[in-house]
């Protein structure tokens, strides 16, 4: 990974850090688009979807189908559950999952097909529980939830396709390096969260 790419990654992470509590809606763009952008604006959601998509794509096309199906179903169940969980608890769960998945990604661990859908369902369900909108009124809530589901699914699909398309040896190495950086970033955020709780 060259120096420019490292700088871009660091600046991106620093830019995302103020958005750690970005569950509040953006004004004047509507409920659907707020939901659509939600996975991009919450760092723990963004990191977990990125590493999940990279890992699933690394496993190859046969693994992507159960991964996508498991994620879509679990995300839908989480959104439909209608019971939010504490934001800090969700952040911890997602970042710990991202850390574990990033280790598998960095070491290019091959997962059996029957095992691929388990981390996808875990991440999808927690994302769904942590994506409950602040809107009132069932129509607004429904639009926000629909946007959240579609945004997360499209983001995961794009990352999976990108990762699966990286077939050259140097590209596979770059994916593994990205996994290591994502894991390091997740650990950094976890460390900061732990430090803030103990301070």
Task: Give the positions of each predicted feature.
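Membrane metalloprotein/metal-transporter helix-bundle signature
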Residues: 2-10, 17-199
